[in-house]
Amino acid sequence: MTTDTIVAQATAPGRGGVGIIRVSGPQAAQVALEVTGKTLKARYAEYLPFKAQDGSELDQGIALFFPNPHSFTGEDVLELQGHGGPVVMDMLIKRILTISGVRPARPGEFSERAFLNDKMDLTQAEAIADLIDASSEEAAKSALQSLQGQFSKRIHTLVESLIHLRIYVEAAIDFPEEEIDFLADGKVAGDLQAIIDNLDAVRKEANQGAIMREGMKVVIAGRPNAGKSSLLNALSGKDSAIVTDIAGTTRDVLREHIHIDGMPLHIIDTAGLRDASDEVEKIGIERAWDEIRQADRVLFMVDGTTTDATDPKEIWPDFIDRLPEQIGITVIRNKADQTQESLGICHVSQPTLIRLSAKTGQGVEALRNHLKECMGFSGNSEGGFMARRRHLDALQRAAEHLLIGQEQLEGYMAGEILAEELRIAQQHLNEITGEFSSDDLLGRIFSSFCIGK
């Protein structure tokens, strides 16, 4: 149980019409009394002067007091809404910190206290940060769904199903003398398969939510003058990169952040890959390889006027040999406006081949759709929820243990092993909502939040 009181600015730092100071903890009522000079009514907005220790006015604004447990954190909470200048906000915080028992809040500590006081679970707490950081309307809607508990409900449904199945399996183990073989009667196998199917559906939705949050990192790579910078400009819809006929124009990494039907896309244009003698260009090429190694997908640009080949191993075997195996690659035959090739995607080719003209924009829409397909992104965020990498990992581990349990049941009727695998799967699901979490995990999650949240 926390005994100290915390304070922080809840609004973004900098100038603004309104700035909000948030206080949470047992001293919140005392802070209100000392700063406003009166005892505040619960959940009642009052326009009052905010006073310094000597009684002089620091600012004027609205004061709101929320007694526990009916507050965001579940503790006594005070909000002071004053003028949003950084100097005014700083003076108010310094004034509040003169009161005994009050200290500055750590990043995410208000949300952490809300979680610890059962005002929200871990996925809802994380959704607050995701909603603040949302880079598109679709991402904001998904984060709001998580904040409202949609993701949590799906996890709780799975956990409840697991609990009921565990009870049935444990009963079969504890009462082997019963005439009916509960493990062989088909109910356990049927219920287990239903849980596996439901978990698969949640994993697919969670993957969509993770894409919405994290986006896709796409690196445009190839030899100099293949049209990489022109493709960056075509995808971003603006002249982000300088385009000339001079090979080696791009010497450093260029980045653009765009959205394709709500899917965040981090596009990176790199220096043309070749054996360069110029020291600056060499550095740019090495940086290009650094980005390629971290990519979700590489767009391998080929100047269609220089070769008829479509296989990257034939076009540039050294590049393919150096490319990490796990990274997907799409071959882009550029300058189709000059070669008169048919535009669009060739599905029978491995890797995928797309013919386009980065200069005119012809065929670029096919590339956009291809990138969505590569990430399994449906573009339908209605009813979807936001997810993080740790959620995907926990769901995957839960699925793995369920499949092990299913194998033990079907192959060996091993009830004890099945029961243990079900228990571990439930534990991994509980990690998502925070019903089973280490202090280290909580520390990592909340430390990534804004101060004041």
From Swiss-Prot:
Identification of the protein by name: tRNA modification GTPase MnmE
Residues the entry annotates as binding GTP: 225-230, 244-250, 269-272, 334-337
SUPFAM superfamilies noted in UniProt: P-loop containing nucleoside triphosphate hydrolases, TrmE connector domain
EC numbers for this chain: 3.6.-.-
GO cellular component: cytosol
Gene that encodes the chain: mnmE
Transmembrane segments: none
Signal peptide residue numbers: none
Organism of provenance: Vibrio vulnificus (strain YJ016)
Family per record: Belongs to the TRAFAC class TrmE-Era-EngA-EngB-Septin-like GTPase superfamily. TrmE GTPase family.
A Pfam family hit: MMR_HSR1
Ranges for domain TrmE-type G: 215-376
Main localisation: cytoplasm
UniProt key word Ribonucleoprotein: no
